[in-house]
């Protein structure tokens, strides 16, 4: 019939949850260590704590509220600081939007005057500043 040990185990109510033994749990809670701690604790509120504290230190709520509402009036809620979004494709914008004819003319103009001029020739490109070569490559074209 049931030659295999795993089949026999399954038939004996494996789906029923086991009963918890409450007596043992309560006995653990009421151990001698807990009574010991309660006895040691001093009544003085300014005395240092003997019980171990958690390693994470939480900032107190009163300190947070004071720091946020320094400038604002007491009735108003503190203003949230917004993080500025990073512009991801700033450098790529200038590399892709220039035409070869305008960049060569801009580079010749910029050598005579210190400020870069806005060229009207840029064929519909939205880039206002010309593309400059890196320092180690500039010697090739001058």
Curated annotation (Swiss-Prot):
Cite the record's Basic residues compositional bias ranges. 17-40, 80-94
Compositional bias of type Low complexity: which residue ranges? 99-117
Q: Protein name, please? A: ORF1/2 protein
Where is this chain compositionally biased, Polar residues type?
A: 62-76
Q: Where is this region: Disordered?
A: 17-142
Organism whose genome encodes this protein = Torque teno virus (isolate Human/Finland/Hel32/2002)
């Amino acid at each position: 019939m049931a030659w295999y040990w795993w089949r026999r185990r399954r038939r004996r109510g494996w789906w029923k949850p086991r009963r918890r033994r409450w007596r043992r749990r309560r006995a653990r809670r009421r151990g001698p260590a807990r009574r010991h701690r309660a006895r040691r604790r001093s009544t003085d509120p300014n005395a240092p704590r003997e019980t171990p504290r958690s390693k994470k230190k939480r900032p107190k709520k009163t300190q947070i509220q004071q720091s946020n509402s320094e400038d604002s009036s007491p009735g108003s809620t503190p203003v949230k600081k917004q993080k500025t979004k990073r512009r991801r494709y700033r450098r790529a914008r200038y590399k892709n939007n220039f035409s070869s004819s305008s960049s060569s003319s801009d580079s010749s103009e910029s050598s005579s005057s210190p400020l870069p001029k806005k060229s009207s020739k840029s064929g519909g490109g939205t880039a206002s500043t010309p593309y400059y070569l890196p320092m180690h490559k500039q010697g090739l074209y001058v």
